[in-house]
Amino acid sequence: MNIYKLALAFATATLSLSAVCGELEDGFKNPPADAEPKASQEATGDVAALKLQNDAALLAGKDDIACNPAWPGAKELIRYVARCRYLFRASKAADKADAGRTFKDGTVGFFATHPTDKQSAAVSLDFPVTGKHPELWDPATGRILRPSKSSEAGGRTTVVWNADPGASVFVMFRPQPSSAKKAPKILASQIQDVEVTGTWDPEPTPDTAFANKTFRFSEGLFRLPGYATMAWIDLGKAKGVFEIKVNGKKFPTLWKPPYRLNIADALSFEADGHSTEPGADIGQQAELNVELKANGSFGTITWQAICD
């Protein structure tokens, strides 16, 4: 586990959480009507690189963002920046390290980033806060979760954040517990590869750049050796922007690592087992129809799952 002292944060200010984020049940998926900032310059690289550039600008207290509004994925990137800016509006880089931002309802908030875009990690973040209830607010998805683990000692609180490569998070310490769900603790040893039948049309070529090209996977049978709690499609080493539909369900645009989606919500599993003998191979199976719209390059597509 990596230990990070939070060295980047924001000066104290007062701003109503409800004015920025709405009620907790709505997450913070809907910023105020004026929250869509205008892009100030053209895109100069892939979205993941722009995200890191924007993170740096936000931490430095700058308002400019790098994004071409006509570029695929620009809407998601602009929404991401809007969430960041409007949550910490009127703030600037703090003179004192790990100074948080205090809101009118007593919530104290911090902003942190995972420094690498190469691998996921369980990151331990250390904050000068006690007696409050920590939550992890994901600006990329709008989800609000309780950390999988947290502890208090010596006037500080340590929060474990299961961070994806290059991810950012708001760590919010609330005065009262909320209905936020606990973040799942996913171990690499739990994830297993899944064999899927069927073919792509056309067959994608790994590490080849595509512009607005659609690939379809159909007539496949997604079969699992147990009962799935999560099921993923993984685009491997990818760069660019990708839109994915599974069995007609549209998922959030992928524009930064990890280029992986949990598609379990789009799968209607049925029991798969025809024997009552001890040790029989009983699991789940589901039809699988995928539409992948690619603006960029991706690696070998794989399927993974966590099964009970």
Language-model segment annotations:
Residues 2-20:
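Gram-negative bacterial Sec-dependent N-terminal signal peptides
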Residues 152-153, 176-177, 252-260:
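A short acidic/small-residue loop/turn micro-motif
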Residues 126, 221-250, 255, 288-291:
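Aromatic-lined ligand-binding clefts that engage carbohydrates, nucleic acids, or primary amines
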Residues 168-174, 229-231, 282-292:
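Short, well-structured beta-strand segments enriched in hydrophobic/aromatic residues
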Residues 22-212, 225, 295-298, 305-308:
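Carbohydrate-binding surfaces of carbohydrate-active enzymes
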Residues 236, 242-243, 253-270, 274-277, ...:
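Membrane-proximal, cysteine-centered motifs at transmembrane boundaries in secretory-pathway
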